[in-house]
Amino acid sequence: MLRRANRGNVAQKSVAQDRRNNMEVVHHGGKASVTGSCHEMRADGQALLIDCGLFQGADERPLAVEFSLGHVDALILTHAHIDHIGRLPWLLAAGFKQPIYCTAATAELVPLMLEDGLKLQLGMSPKQSERVLTEVRRLLRVQDYQKWFAVQPKRADSLWVRFQPAGHILGSAYVEIRRPNGEVVVFSGDLGPSHTPLLPDPQSPERADYLFIETTYGDKQHEDVQSRGQRLRAMIERSLTDGGAILIPAFSVGRTQELLFDIEQLIFSQQIDANLPIILDSPMAQRVTRSYRRFKQLWGREAKARLQMHRHPLAFEQCITVEDHRTHERLVNRLASTGEAAIVVAASGMCQGGRIVDYLKALLPDKRTDLILAGFQAEGTLGRSIQSGQSSVWIEGTEVEVNAHIHTMSGYSAHADKADLLRFITGIPEKPKQVHLIHGETSAKQAFAAELTQLGYSVL
């Protein structure tokens, strides 16, 4: 059972100035941090929650939902990453019974992601976990992209909501909320970068009177996404000269599929040895990848073109999947003892859990090992500690030497960079009355705020 904690999380209030209709947004997470997204919009006698995510890394705090829920009409989910849905079990434990709206792909991914979290983080039995998941499934309400729906159809002054493709992961969306007075409030969720081959680029909203936008990379420019496959090839070639394994920690949703997509292209174009073992050691990632294949209609133009060539970019024959834990243990021991070459893609992306941890414990001390960090490593995570160049790290109570070669590679971020964010905002035909910066570290938000202020935007 989930119990309510004695102390709650501090909510940060951000008031969008509309005195006549008394609209406000209260942040229950994800305002001053990258994780734990949970925003409550109160307007026109109604209230919506947008996401209810898990706090991770340095943001970790008690997860019990202490804020009032009796007045909340619905929960809107932008996508299925755990830092946007991970507090759902605590929300239910606090008595939430209202509809949970999301896209079809997100509705398929949410139970998968939560099941993994309930098992790993709470140690729930399958029976306990299924009880929670059954209730989540009961509340889920699937909505199509680009179609308005009323939160309270029986009210003449209902808030209306619309999902637009966000390009972040499969099923991801930014949320448009239309008020009775015609104003539109937009919550970006997590926006994807431009020019990724697997998902289409996000398009700017037609209107956003109040914009709440993520700033994960508000102060950074990614390397060119279109050339990332060649950078990956060069990194693999360099790593193979060391001998040993190439480890790539990757989130089960999004980055794993992007990596497989590029590796398939390198094999197809004969730029890496077709006999090099490509190991996907993440049961969750395997299930998610099957979901990606089922929702091919959401893929981008380049990905669909490969399908028309009868290629299988997420299920190519060289990709070996590891199902059971015994096989996983044998593989870790084999790579540690033989030093043979292989590419291992395993969760989790920030090295905070999952099967990648076993590989790190066994192979970080080996100078033949190469570790490619292909995404954001939040402060306080094992991934950030390794990335910062520490000579040793603590893993599950054991001090582990870091002799492996550590590489950081951009281009695989599922987040928009500074240029993408600016393009999204400046693409809105009329400037928002207010732009609220959320989901970012302080330095990123400050730098991005300065850019927007110079362009004449009102930034909070």
Regions found by a protein language model. Name each.
Residues 394-425:
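Generic long, charged, amphipathic alpha-helical segments
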Residues 42-44, 177-179, 202-205, 228, ...:
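Short, solvent-exposed amphipathic alpha-helical segments in soluble enzyme
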Residues 235-374, 379:
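Hard-cation-handling environments
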Residues 365-401:
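Redox- and metal-dependent alpha/beta enzyme cores, enriched for Fe-S-associated oxidoreductases
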Residues 208-220, 398-408, 429:
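Gly-rich Lys/Arg/Thr-decorated short loops/hinges at beta-loop-alpha junctions or inter-strand turns
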